[in-house]
Amino acid sequence: MLLSLVLHTYSMRYLLPSVVLLGTAPTYVLAWGVWRLLSAFLPARFYQALDDRLYCVYQSMVLFFFENYTGVQILLYGDLPKNKENIIYLANHQSTVDWIVADILAIRQNALGHVRYVLKEGLKWLPLYGCYFAQHGGIYVKRSAKFNEKEMRNKLQSYVDAGTPMYLVIFPEGTRYNPEQTKVLSASQAFAAQRGLAVLKHVLTPRIKATHVAFDCMKNYLDAIYDVTVVYEGKDDGGQRRESPTMTEFLCKECPKIHIHIDRIDKKDVPEEQEHMRRWLHERFEIKDKMLIEFYESPDPERRKRFPGKSVNSKLSIKKTLPSMLILSGLTAGMLMTDAGRKLYVNTWIYGTLLGCLWVTIKA
């Protein structure tokens, strides 16, 4: 009986956020769809400006749950500018929460609506979200030999030509690092060794294609590159690295701290030629690896479980997130209170998903 109560209480921690985040998706897509139609005959910059604002509202609600609700402590190291910039965001990849870390930084620069992602191809089939991410400026890419460089270049160039604010998030490893997946780690290390690159322990060998294409297309438009290194501190990891939390585990408050190190790199310090950039990118991941080795394995307790340099405990004001949650939840609740609203809500899930899948099949 007691165990059942404990398990029930645990599950309730993520049930409310999950219901609200998924439950408001049709409301958000409807609002976006209406604006898409109304702005059809307006200059593209008007559509983009309000779309970015709508995206900011939804992602602020996401941060209400992932930051305010969980009470996670955000520790920032390095140099995060206060003002928004056009940037490429390069980070180590280890959890489904990683994309929310980009939000965590962007909202502190008033750039939350400008966040766009380079995403793996399979995510375009997500109901409602898959189509919308592409509409918002996300770019779906295939791995290795199937990578469509021309398609990515065309999309990025169109955003640059339109003056679209860019906070472009790329995870160069291409897949999530998991210390328990030893075969993946061994294959990554073998790949590096075959190419004469340093073998890495706490990150996977980065792939260059998406990063090179993004920089080559946007180099005259960018302000900088952000090299971001992230650690999710567990409650009891005994000094050993363990698998990073999933979204569900994170919402269950299993991650008390996120350590985020930001290195702002001026674009003039990034080599343009692909092979030189490959070496440069690998060197950046060598730096990450050394920081992570120090974080997890340093014999000095003063240097363990922290990044080098001074940390800032950055707390996000609930005033920036709660209004968005109340607005979207209120609109959704109002829709569900009438027969017509419920029908519209269900049809949005069904037909929005089908039309979205059709659209990404043709376009994305």
From Swiss-Prot:
<dbReference type="GO" id="GO:0016024">
    <property type="term" value="P:CDP-diacylglycerol biosynthetic process"/>
</dbReference>
<feature type="transmembrane region" description="Helical">
    <location>
        <begin position="15"/>
        <end position="35"/>
    </location>
</feature>
<dbReference type="GO" id="GO:0006654">
    <property type="term" value="P:phosphatidic acid biosynthetic process"/>
</dbReference>
<comment type="similarity">
    <text>Belongs to the 1-acyl-sn-glycerol-3-phosphate acyltransferase family.</text>
</comment>
<dbReference type="InterPro" id="IPR002123">
    <property type="entry name" value="Plipid/glycerol_acylTrfase"/>
</dbReference>
<comment type="function">
    <text>Converts 1-acyl-sn-glycerol-3-phosphate (lysophosphatidic acid or LPA) into 1,2-diacyl-sn-glycerol-3-phosphate (phosphatidic acid or PA) by incorporating an acyl moiety at the sn-2 position of the glycerol backbone. Acts on LPA containing saturated or unsaturated fatty acids C15:0-C20:4 at the sn-1 position using C18:1-CoA as the acyl donor. Also acts on lysophosphatidylethanolamine using oleoyl-CoA, but not arachidonoyl-CoA, and lysophosphatidylinositol using arachidonoyl-CoA, but not oleoyl-CoA. Activity toward lysophosphatidylglycerol not detectable.</text>
</comment>
<dbReference type="GO" id="GO:0002244">
    <property type="term" value="P:hematopoietic progenitor cell differentiation"/>
</dbReference>
<feature type="transmembrane region" description="Helical">
    <location>
        <begin position="61"/>
        <end position="81"/>
    </location>
</feature>
<dbReference type="GO" id="GO:0008654">
    <property type="term" value="P:phospholipid biosynthetic process"/>
</dbReference>
<protein>
    <recommendedName>
        <fullName>1-acyl-sn-glycerol-3-phosphate acyltransferase epsilon</fullName>
        <ecNumber>2.3.1.51</ecNumber>
    </recommendedName>
</protein>
<feature type="short sequence motif" description="HXXXXD motif">
    <location>
        <begin position="93"/>
        <end position="98"/>
    </location>
</feature>
<dbReference type="Pfam" id="PF01553">
    <property type="entry name" value="Acyltransferase"/>
</dbReference>
<dbReference type="GO" id="GO:0036149">
    <property type="term" value="P:phosphatidylinositol acyl-chain remodeling"/>
</dbReference>
<keyword id="KW-0443">Lipid metabolism</keyword>
<dbReference type="GO" id="GO:0006639">
    <property type="term" value="P:acylglycerol metabolic process"/>
</dbReference>
<keyword id="KW-0808">Transferase</keyword>
<keyword id="KW-0472">Membrane</keyword>
<dbReference type="GO" id="GO:0005739">
    <property type="term" value="C:mitochondrion"/>
</dbReference>
<keyword id="KW-0012">Acyltransferase</keyword>
<dbReference type="GO" id="GO:0003841">
    <property type="term" value="F:1-acylglycerol-3-phosphate O-acyltransferase activity"/>
</dbReference>
<keyword id="KW-0812">Transmembrane</keyword>
<dbReference type="GO" id="GO:0005783">
    <property type="term" value="C:endoplasmic reticulum"/>
</dbReference>
<dbReference type="InterPro" id="IPR032098">
    <property type="entry name" value="Acyltransf_C"/>
</dbReference>
<keyword id="KW-0539">Nucleus</keyword>
<keyword id="KW-0256">Endoplasmic reticulum</keyword>
<comment type="pathway">
    <text>Phospholipid metabolism; CDP-diacylglycerol biosynthesis; CDP-diacylglycerol from sn-glycerol 3-phosphate: step 2/3.</text>
</comment>
<keyword id="KW-1133">Transmembrane helix</keyword>
<dbReference type="GO" id="GO:0005730">
    <property type="term" value="C:nucleolus"/>
</dbReference>
<feature type="transmembrane region" description="Helical">
    <location>
        <begin position="344"/>
        <end position="364"/>
    </location>
</feature>
<dbReference type="GO" id="GO:0005789">
    <property type="term" value="C:endoplasmic reticulum membrane"/>
</dbReference>
<dbReference type="GO" id="GO:0016746">
    <property type="term" value="F:acyltransferase activity"/>
</dbReference>
<dbReference type="Pfam" id="PF16076">
    <property type="entry name" value="Acyltransf_C"/>
</dbReference>
<keyword id="KW-1208">Phospholipid metabolism</keyword>
<dbReference type="GO" id="GO:0005635">
    <property type="term" value="C:nuclear envelope"/>
</dbReference>
<dbReference type="GO" id="GO:0005741">
    <property type="term" value="C:mitochondrial outer membrane"/>
</dbReference>
<dbReference type="GO" id="GO:0012505">
    <property type="term" value="C:endomembrane system"/>
</dbReference>
<keyword id="KW-0594">Phospholipid biosynthesis</keyword>
<keyword id="KW-0444">Lipid biosynthesis</keyword>
<keyword id="KW-0496">Mitochondrion</keyword>
